[in-house]
């Protein structure tokens, strides 16, 4: 398996690790680690995301880089440098990519967009503070945001929710409108107001078998998503059924920090700051299991196919399959802050498959040449014998 890891001292590490590796065992095979970049805490890695063969890296000092991981060694290019004045009173809370646009969200409500091909820049100002921002994974121009005492809102610059919209028309300030404003749950059993602090958002159409946007029978917009909170709640929303969540669950006594989907098994995961990473089944409305062995609060979780990679304060990279079976574990000296699974399969298996494929093609080529030779022999004119 191949991973890309960013750390607090500014380095990026390519890690090749085999299934079954466990560096806590002295007899285990060590992973192969390639390091890139100089040691500089001001350039500490905050976020990474992968699109096709490019990995975008957001650093603490506002530098945004693009890595082409298809090259050997990977090619690094500086993509964008944020104005330092933007980071004097705010911090980067999210980085997302959708339909040609890279988005950076700041805690004060500023959203900055850059079109990768044309280098066009656009800026939106949402109501802050923000601690969670998410773009819809399928529908262009849909964004969800929320924060401390700032309940979740949906904004759109694509009113028809069509997928073939001209991407250069996205994120124009004059076209962005609020399409949903979340409402707090009812007072608790003591008739006290429930505090609001959104710390994560994920759109859930992939795990509950629905389609967001507009349907042929109904012109009204409909979106399905989940939020996590600083106060340990997991909430599900269906915008057709009102502004309040359709269901809410107290799943932890510790602040929740991460939420995401496991599409291969139609489940959702969430993590708290006590190193509990849990799996939630929406159809059963309950937690059905946890990833075991994680010792420190997670700083980053990434899922690719059937593989889940987790890293955090215990300075370990832990890899599981989607059914929570441990696949590998490696200790990393510098505190990891972000992780991406580049390839979920072992390099040796890929090499063997490539060799088998090459041998198969060679054998087929030999048979094709033999058939052509036989056809040529059959077409040769036979000599007549004179009597």
UniProtKB/Swiss-Prot annotation:
Keyword line: Nucleus, Ribosome biogenesis, rRNA processing
Keyword Metal-binding: no
Segments for region (Disordered): 368-387
One GO term (biological process): rRNA processing
InterPro entries registered for this protein in UniProt: WD40/YVTN_repeat-like_dom_sf, WD40_repeat_dom_sf, WD40_rpt, WDR74/Nsa1
Cellular component GO terms, alphabetical: nucleolus; nucleus; preribosome; preribosome, large subunit precursor
Top-rank taxon: Eukaryota
Organism, scientific name: Schizosaccharomyces pombe (strain 972 / ATCC 24843)
Family label: Belongs to the NSA1 family.
The protein, known as: Ribosome biogenesis protein nsa1
Compartments where located: Nucleus, Nucleolus
